[in-house]
């Protein structure tokens, strides 16, 4: 099944065959030499041009490629390694190792183009995916097998939340994670790898990188490479897998570039006419089955903060929850800096999460919203001008704000505080107590960076003892001065 290259137009390569026509999405391999080095280039069939000629998209740079070079059709789509051997390693779009580790043979490989699970195999139960992070589980819970949009600028803690989720899935759910860097900066990918190494979560995650400098084919298909690895863990091993995609916008962007290179007429704002169907095909594979689930957290870049842009707007249609990180909250020193009022979830429904959880979550949001509304009055007139009822709202809101923070396992290295995983029942009980006024007598500092409410009570006692000790010390100094 050999052919030869008839045309090279950047990342688009035309290949002619004599008596064979490769199918759409079939892989074609070209082995060639350039500047004294041997190269292996993988192409993917994108269109049939007639007369046994196919138009392909290259998965790597086409520098050094010339007309007339032999090309071999593999008779199948790009296949990538799957199974436990992929954990702790970095792969490119074609499933080759790109880290500094030793080369190992992979006995299992799956094609990256797959159908979503059959309807009868899918699980229709609405279940919460417990993360152990208070603010997420209480106010914007994730659906098992659902899709979460992670919104946040640089430096507000996206990577730390991603690593904490990977840690909690590994150690509390005995599950694995897959990270797909779609159009990532090489430096960011490198930083993430090193941080995971330091945080001891690397052996529970497979990393797939299609970096920013790579052709659009690689940046687009890397999402499918990562998803295929996650599907194996779900379908063959029956696990609940967490899949991270950073950034899902780059998936649409690279698809738009590929579409333009293939000569298709663009749609709105220059995007590919098949944007919605491509996104739908990809997102439909991320689901729960009766065996296991893939829950995905997708970082979403919004170009020029325009939520009506077709790329983010297409993603929103598929999301079950949004986790919004807020710089103003991070500046207060409250981590994770998740915005409790902006973050949403379709799971926040009394029929799914139960009446008690729903009432507590809405109560917390109501108190925080009232506090937000009162902030202008406090800034101009001060706390003394508020009614007694409003003062109580402010006090409880500040305690809630502090209690929404928690120490992370992966941040132990630089905070010195041991990480905490908080069960949903403990989270609900703690916030319910604050709303009911059970802990009005405790200082607000007692609620900062603790796990459950018992730890807040213990911290309040410790603060009281420190305060008593300081008072005693001051009294001793006064007595000493009098004696002198």
UniProtKB/Swiss-Prot annotation:
Alphabetized CDD domains for the sequence: ATP-synt_F1_beta_C, ATP-synt_F1_beta_N, F1-ATPase_beta_CD
Keywords: ATP synthesis, ATP-binding, Cell inner membrane, Cell membrane, CF(1), Hydrogen ion transport, Ion transport, Membrane, Nucleotide-binding, Translocase, Transport
Binding-site residues, ATP: 152-159
One GO cellular component term: plasma membrane
InterPro entries attached to this UniProt entry: AAA+_ATPase, ATP-synt_VA_C, ATP_synth_F1_bsu, ATPase_a/bsu_AS, ATPase_alpha/beta_chains, ATPase_F1/V1/A1_a/bsu_N, ATPase_F1/V1/A1_a/bsu_N_sf, ATPase_F1/V1/A1_a/bsu_nucl-bd
Subcellular location: Cell inner membrane
PROSITE patterns named in the record: ATPASE_ALPHA_BETA (PS00152)
UniProt enzyme class: translocase
Major location category of this protein: membrane
Pfam hit, one: ATP-synt_ab
Nucleotide-binding listed as a keyword: yes
Membrane topology: Peripheral membrane protein
EC identifiers of the protein: 7.1.2.2
Transmembrane stretches, start-end: none
MF (Gene Ontology): ATP binding; ATP hydrolysis activity; proton-transporting ATP synthase activity, rotational mechanism
Catalytic reactions on record: ATP + H2O + 4 H(+)(in) = ADP + phosphate + 5 H(+)(out)
Assembly with partners or alone: F-type ATPases have 2 components, CF(1) - the catalytic core - and CF(0) - the membrane proton channel. CF(1) has five subunits: alpha(3), beta(3), gamma(1), delta(1), epsilon(1). CF(0) has three main subunits: a(1), b(2) and c(9-12). The alpha and beta chains form an alternating ring which encloses part of the gamma chain. CF(1) is attached to CF(0) by a central stalk formed by the gamma and epsilon chains, while a peripheral stalk is formed by the delta and b chains.
Similarity remark: Belongs to the ATPase alpha/beta chains family.
PANTHER family: ATP SYNTHASE, ATP SYNTHASE SUBUNIT BETA, MITOCHONDRIAL
Record's function text: Produces ATP from ADP in the presence of a proton gradient across the membrane. The catalytic sites are hosted primarily by the beta subunits.
Stated name of the protein: ATP synthase subunit beta
Species for this entry: Campylobacter jejuni subsp. doylei (strain ATCC BAA-1458 / RM4099 / 269.97)
């Amino acid at each position: 099944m050999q052919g030869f290259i008839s045309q090279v137009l950047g990342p688009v390569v035309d290949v002619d065959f004599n008596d064979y026509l490769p199918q759409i999405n079939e892989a074609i391999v070209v082995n060639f030499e350039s500047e004294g080095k041997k190269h292996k280039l993988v192409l993917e069939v994108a269109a049939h041009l007639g007369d046994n000629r196919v138009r392909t998209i290259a998965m790597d740079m086409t520098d050094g490629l010339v007309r007339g070079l032999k090309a071999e059709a593999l008779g199948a789509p790009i296949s990538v390694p799957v199974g436990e051997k992929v954990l702790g390693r970095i792969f490119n779009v074609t499933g080759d190792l790109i880290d500094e580790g030793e080369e190992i043979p992979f006995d299992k490989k799956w094609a990256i183009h797959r159908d979503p699970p059959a309807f009868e195999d899918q699980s229709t139960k609405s279940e919460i995916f417990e993360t152990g992070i208070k603010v997420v589980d209480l106010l914007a819970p994730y659906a098992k097998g659902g899709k979460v949009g992670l919104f946040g600028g640089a430096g507000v803690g996206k990577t730390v939340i991603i690593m904490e989720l990977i840690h909690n899935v590994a150690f509390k759910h005995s599950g694995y994670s897959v990270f797909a860097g779609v159009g990532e900066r090489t430096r960011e990918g490198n930083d993430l790898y090193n941080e995971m190494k330091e945080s001891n979560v690397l052996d529970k995650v497979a990393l797939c990188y299609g970096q920013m400098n790579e052709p659009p084919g690689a940046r687009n298909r890397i999402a499918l490479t990562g998803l295929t690895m996650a599907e194996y863990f779900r379908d063959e091993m029956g696990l609940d897998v967490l899949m991270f995609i950073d950034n899902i916008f780059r998936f649409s962007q690279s698809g738009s570039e590929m579409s333009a290179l293939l000569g298709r007429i663009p749609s709105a704002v220059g995007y590919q006419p098949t944007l919605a169907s491509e996104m739908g095909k990809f997102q439909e594979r991320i689901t729960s089955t009766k065996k296991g689930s893939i829950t995905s957290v997708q970082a979403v870049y919004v170009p020029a903060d325009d939520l009506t842009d077709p790329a983010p707007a297409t993603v929103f249609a598929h999301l079950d929850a949004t986790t919004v990180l807020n710089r103003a909250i991070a500046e207060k020193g409250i981590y994770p800096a998740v915005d409790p009022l902006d973050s949403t979830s379709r799971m926040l429904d009394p029929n799914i999460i139960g009446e008690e959880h729903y009432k507590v979550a809405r109560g917390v949001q109501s108190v925080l919203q009232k506090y937000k509304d009162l902030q202008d009055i406090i800034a101009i007139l001060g706390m003394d001008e508020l009614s007694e009822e409003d003062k109580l709202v402010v006090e409880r809101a500040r305690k809630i704000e502090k209690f929404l923070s928690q120490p992370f396992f992966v941040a132990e290295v630089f905070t010195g505080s041991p990480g905490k995983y908080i069960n949903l029942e403990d989270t609900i009980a703690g916030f319910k107590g604050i709303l009911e006024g059970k802990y009005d007598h405790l200082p607000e500092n007692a609620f900062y960076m603790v796990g459950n409410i018992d730890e807040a009570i213990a911290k309040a006692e410790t603060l009281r003892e420190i305060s008593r000790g300081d008072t005693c010390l001051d009294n001793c100094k006064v007595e000493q001065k009098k004696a002198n």
